[in-house]
Amino acid sequence: ALENVKEKFNCATAIFDVLNYISKRDLKKFLKEINLVLNQGGYFIFDVNSAFGFEEVAQGTITIDVEDKFIAIDANFEDNKLQTDITLFEKQENGFFSKQSDSIIQEYHPKKSLLKFLKECNFEVIDIKEFNLHTSENADKLIFICKKIA
């Protein structure tokens, strides 16, 4: 865990939905630990999925059929959590298919909650950028640029 890191840094990043993989229960602890590894005035930059990103972009089913592999990805957003079930079927040399399955869970953190936790963990939010990966109308990601103030 970050409390074991002895060095101090001018900037820390958490990209590709890292905070969405952290439960609401553990999020404040994570932010406190990020604060510990930053120099005074250091920056913390991270992205999170927006509600639109979870509800309209990530949720749904995708299937991919390529030669000797078939992948099914099924994502369901409910109670502020996105559960994604991934199943891979792969053709073996004997002609049979093997099956592997796994699930991942991401949690939606509302902007209001993030702002509250960041303030409580001594971060000033310098900017929040809306990022549109899939549509020009609605942001599916938010990028937070924060500065350690204490």
Where are the predicted features?
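Short, hinge-like loop/turn segments at secondary-structure boundaries
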Residues: 12-13, 61-65, 144-145
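A short glycine-rich, Lys/Arg-flanked "PGG" loop and its adjoining helix->strand segment in the class I
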Residues: 28-43
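A short SAM/SAH-binding and catalytic strip from SAM-dependent methyltransferases
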Residues: 10-26
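Conserved beta-strand edge residues that scaffold enzyme active sites
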Residues: 1-2, 51-52, 131-133
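Short aromatic-enriched loop/helix-cap "lid" or pocket-rim segments at secondary-structure transitions
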Residues: 8-9, 56-60, 140
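A short acidic, Gly/Pro-enriched loop at the edge of an enzyme's catalytic core
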Residues: 2-12
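SAM-dependent methyltransferase
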Residues: 25, 45-112
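C-terminal lobe and adjacent flexible extensions of AdoMet/dcAdoMet transferase-like proteins
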Residues: 111-150
